[in-house]
Amino acid sequence: MAGTGLFAEILDGEVYKYYADGEWKTSSSGKSVAIMNPATRKTQYKVQACTQEEVNAVMELAKSAQKSWAKTPLWKRAELLHKAAAILKDNKAPMAESLVKEIAKPAKDSVTEVVRSGDLISYCAEEGVRILGEGKFLLSDSFPGNDRTKYCLTSKIPLGVVLAIPPFNYPVNLAVSKIAPALIAGNSLVLKPPTQGAVSCLHMVHCFHLAGFPKGLISCITGKGSEIGDFLTMHPAVNCISFTGGDTGISISKKAGMIPLQMELGGKDACIVLDDADLDLVASNIIKGGFSYSGQRCTAVKVVLVMESVADELVEKVKAKVAKLTVGPPEENSDITAVVSESSANFIEGLVMDAKEKGATFCQEYKREGNLIWPLLLDNVRPDMRIAWEEPFGPVVPVLRINSVEEGINHCNASNFGLQGCVFTKDINKAILISDAMETGTVQINSAPARGPDHFPFQGLKDSGIGSQGVTNSINLMTKVKTTVINLPTPSYSMG
């Protein structure tokens, strides 16, 4: 169970502790933040409400610990990461249980997230040794007008303190995707987990603690965003911010100052379906892409743009598959579970009601019980409906019928988002041309949008983000180039 056995020390009565200076601590505030179970809508867990003074203390510890960590050999950093990954995977059950209870993720998917996270840590350790173990050597005479009198040595050095802010929907995986690159690169790491997902993150951090990382190198601060959010993101000790979430990231980017930012802020991922597409394949991918984890994924299929000539057939195929989706508790591995909060459910309902008022065709009856919304396919959606543009983050998929490929591309590109998209066709030449025309960070051909495998580049255009994720890109973003130039008194040529 969560907070027991190996993880007993992270819990103080009913309240989970925060992590700083290699210890689990209670906040001087004497206050806690409640975490609601989305399915029961009752308090499931409580975490510490940390203060700004505690944030300051954590930042000072992080700055100090980073200096010595930067001098730790790469192989030793990698060794500790491999150890943390093994502990994480060996103790997946408590974290998976927490994911089920605090974000209503189906049990089997919760286990998968933890195992995937362990694999990501190990991969990052190996990739970091390769990337950071190589330098670069330049000679001055390759540039016109120069003799070979200068030798340039370049290497990658850490940035300092990295602030990691993962989202509720993948709190463990999208935390370690920031933590592991930061640590292998020689940085220290301060984690601010989401409220929904915080307990899963605290269990994950304990795995790093058990692996034996130096005190102060990793910290995990919990609390109310209204009290410590801006204080964290604007803290002068922070040298890099890696954030995944909603449009809060836009506000963070405006306030952060001159530091590297890695931001993934959501999307309105379009699925363009041509008239030659394999419609059975398309239907399966709409179900997988649009309804898995109740549509609460940044890479979910958010709008289907299908050629009119095949729209009727596709809609019927998707309707048949929607009818087979199970709805219920995450403990029972239901396909559709409660969305994360009442406010999220209300927002989704607002989009649905707007579509209803404006004449969309409901392929199923709209049904909601608390935070649980039954899967819904909306046909004949028009561009004047909110659901055509806004991100529902729920189990609702709108279908817009188009009369040309250009119409589909134009709708995709008119969005303020640009995370991912997909195109279904048997003509690879058309697929490549459409991919090039779509203003998104990634285009999937004949598959639903997806983040991963975790070493693939993952980035958004426009309001969907800044920078690129993926193991290699994250390591590079969390380092800077250091150059040393050797000046020779006379030109020197090998074998000259």
From Swiss-Prot:
It catalyses: D-glyceraldehyde 3-phosphate + NADP(+) + H2O = (2R)-3-phosphoglycerate + NADPH + 2 H(+). Belongs to the aldehyde dehydrogenase family. Gene3D superfamilies: Aldehyde Dehydrogenase, Chain A, domain 1 (3.40.605.10), Aldehyde Dehydrogenase, Chain A, domain 2 (3.40.309.10). NADP(+) binds at K192, T195, D230, E391. It comes from the Eukaryota. Its EC number is 1.2.1.9. This is NADP-dependent glyceraldehyde-3-phosphate dehydrogenase. It holds the Pfam family Aldedh. NAD(+) binds at G245, G246, D247, T248, G249. The modification Phosphothreonine is found at T4. Substrate binds at R116, N169, Y170, R297, C298, T299, R451. One of its GO terms (cellular component) is cytoplasm. The active site is at E264 (proton acceptor), C298 (nucleophile). GO terms for molecular function: glyceraldehyde-3-phosphate dehydrogenase (NADP+) (non-phosphorylating) activity. Keywords: Acetylation, Cytoplasm, NADP, Oxidoreductase, Phosphoprotein. InterPro entries: Ald_DH/histidinol_DH, Ald_DH_C, Ald_DH_CS_CYS, Ald_DH_CS_GLU, Ald_DH_N, Aldehyde_DH_dom, ALDH-related_metabolic_enz. The keyword Oxidoreductase applies. It is found in: Cytoplasm. The modification N-acetylalanine is found at A2. It is an enzyme of class 1 (oxidoreductase). Important as a means of generating NADPH for biosynthetic reactions. The record marks N169 as: Transition state stabilizer.
